[in-house]
Regions:
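Ferredoxin-like alpha/beta domains used as RNA- or RNAP-binding modules
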Residues: 1-64
């Protein structure tokens, strides 16, 4: 329901910070954090497709 699929180009075109998820079942995965639609979304690109999941920003740490 809160998962959106976007292309690799769409994921790279948006400004965002590189982050690592530090809590929950996705802990350790790195990607980008974006703010959209009044919430925070974690973006991970796999095989040329971006997956955007709603996440609390407190579950992420900046890796830049």
């Amino acid at each position: 329901k809160d998962t959106l699929y976007i292309t690799h180009e769409e994921a790279e075109a948006k400004p965002g910070k590189n982050v690592r998820i530090i809590h929950g079942p996705f802990a350790g995965i790195t990607g980008k954090l974006h703010r959209a639609r009044g919430g925070y979304y974690f973006i991970k690109t796999l095989a040329g497709v971006g997956v955007m999941m709603r996440i609390s920003r407190w579950y992420c740490e900046v890796t830049e």
